[in-house]
Design a protein with these regions (language model features):
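Conserved G1/Walker A P-loop phosphate-binding module
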Residues: 1-114, 123, 142-143
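C-terminal-of-GTPase-core extension/linker across diverse P-loop GTPases
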Residues: 2-8, 13, 19, 147-355, ...
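Short amphipathic alpha-helical segments with heptad-repeat character
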Residues: 92, 131, 135, 142, ...
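Alpha-helical initiation/capping and key positions within long helical/coiled-coil segments
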Residues: 37, 86, 90, 133, ...
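Conserved Switch II/interswitch segment of TRAFAC-class P-loop GTPases
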Residues: 43-48, 75-85, 96-158, 174-186, ...
Length: 366
């Protein structure tokens, strides 16, 4: 399945440095200038997965294929974007197309990199961006909801669901709260909220960009952001974009030593990628064989035919059953033959809800 995270933030907070490190390219021009990233830069990065390495080793696979997540480096936002100031209109259009927002916040001092607001205050920065998104949503809903209410009063069932859930979102926005706090009462309202593509309904991951010295522990600024995230149902990670950019240029064998010297167990990018994956409500299942072992992505709660469809639409259309082994059983039993002998291979039908880590073989007929 396709899923995209938009990297956003005020100018000069480290967005493009972070994106460059993510994709190990210099595709985005990381310069000390507010609008150095005018066109969105898109990069697909592998989701780090030690489980896949173990599965491939047991299956003696010739190739490993990780699942991927797409990051979009979106042009810097400034105050007034909801009215089209700066690159506001372009920013809002680009962010509307992503599934989740990765909001980079400056949590480091340093006079050599200018701040567009002339101060370092990540909470204020977060509120500046959130306010612009809320104003854009507010403008949209104040025009849409009255029309939906009229249609609902005339007996339009679809409009009734939309009017209910979007009316709730509008009330939240008027209280300066994001639309992601909206609580749809049923699946129909949930679909209506998703169709509305509200900017503040998208899940948010705050990335606290800190100095090298704070990369392992964070600092007072990143702690304040973490507290904010917890209060509003968002997530946060601490990262040093400058360090990650340096790590990205190192040979694999030198990276672990570099991380050890910094007191880090894994790169900040890996933590960020996993956090984004979880934020989108995604899980991983696997296929394994001599030719390749591969990680696949589905939404949490997906049933077996939907997972089969990620491989090929024919698999979903002609789904018969899914021969399934839990990851721990696959490793413990040394692969599919051992799991079968131990009674750990299950034959699951169309109502089976896929579990994170399942190793699956789909049987189908078209």
């Amino acid at each position: 399945m396709g899923f995209r995270c938009g990297i956003v933030g005020l100018p000069n907070v480290g967005k493009s440095t972070l994106f460059n490190a993510l994709t190990e390219t210099a595709a985005a021009q990381a310069a000390n200038y507010p609008f150095c990233t005018i066109e969105p830069n898109v990069g697909r990065v592998a989701v780090p997965d030690p489980r896949l390495d173990k599965i491939a080793a047991i299956a003696k696979s010739a190739q490993e294929i990780e699942t991927q997540i797409e990051f979009v480096d979106i042009a810097g936002l400034v105050r007034g974007a909801s009215k089209g100031e700066g690159l506001g209109n372009q920013f809002l259009a680009n962010i509307r197309e992503v599934d989740a927002i990765v909001h980079v916040l400056r949590c480091f001092e340093g006079g050599d990199v200018t701040h567009v607001e002339g101060r370092v205050d990540p909470i204020a920065d977060a509120e500046t961006v959130e306010t612009e998104l809320m104003l854009a949503d507010l403008d949209s809903l104040e025009r849409r909801v009255p029309n939906l209410v009229k249609k609902a009063q005339q007996g339009d069932k679809e409009a009734k669901a939309e009017a209910s859930v979007l009316g709730q979102a509008l009330d939240l926005l008027r209280e300066t709260k994001p639309a992601r706090l909206t609580q749809p009462k049923d699946a129909e309202e949930e679909r209506a909220l998703k169709r509305a593509q509200l900017l503040t309904a998208k899940p948010v991951l705050y990335v606290c960009n800190v100095d090298e010295a704070d990369a392992a522990t964070g600092n007072a600024l990143s702690a304040a952001v973490a507290a904010k995230a917890e209060c509003e149902g968002a997530a946060s990670v601490v990262i040093s974009a400058a360090i990650e950019s340096e790590i990205a240029t190192l040979p694999e064998e030198e990276r672990q030593a570099f991380l050890f010297d910094l007191g880090l167990e894994e790169t900040g990018l890996n933590r960020m990628i996993h956090a984004a994956y979880a934020l989108l409500g995604l899980i991983t299942f696997y296929t394994a064989g001599p030719k390749e072992s591969r990680a696949w992505t589905v939404r949490d709660g997906a049933k077996a035919p939907e997972a089969a469809g990620e491989i090929h639409s024919d698999f979903e259309r002609g789904f018969i059953r899914a021969e399934t082994i839990a990851y721990d059983d696959y490793i413990r039993c040394g692969g599919e033959p051992g799991a079968r002998d131990a009674g750990k291979l299950r034959s699951e039908g169309k109502d089976y809800v896929v579990q994170d880590g399942d190793v699956m073989l789909f049987r189908f007929n078209v």
